[in-house]
Amino acid sequence: FGVVVKALAYMLRLGGEGLTRAAEYAVLNANYLKKKLENTLDIPFKNRFCAHEFVASAPEGLRALDIAKALLERGIHAPTIYFPLIVHECLMAEPTETESKQTLDAYVAALEEIVAQGRRDPQSLTQAPVNLPVRRLDETAAARHMVLTEDMG
């Protein structure tokens, strides 16, 4: 329920004109990132217009999971990975309307560095993150031995 109240407050605060502008910025930001990253990531739908998000594939020999974890290591929110399922090693970027050009350019630079590092030494990305409180999880063990709890505190 709380998220609905927050969304309504956001819409009321922006108004019709502000919502239109926010949508335009979200679309502009997604298309800007897609264009800037076309030489770094594989863009499967390169010649199609994207709305507020776009999908890319990790370059040959690199995994989307490793790229996402390396972004977390740099303090950058990772994109959605492995969705949609029809895109191999998928990374789905959804820059919001509030991201500045400087933030988008920093994101591009981080991805360029990560991909370059991965091309030089693919194994170097497989342990990321190493400097965060939570390191790489054993996802296979987590899927096989789930611990579900309602205890949130």
Regions found by a protein language model. Give the residues of each.
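PLP-dependent aminotransferase class I/II
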Residues: 1-8
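Non-catalytic terminal extensions of PLP-dependent enzymes
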Residues: 11-153
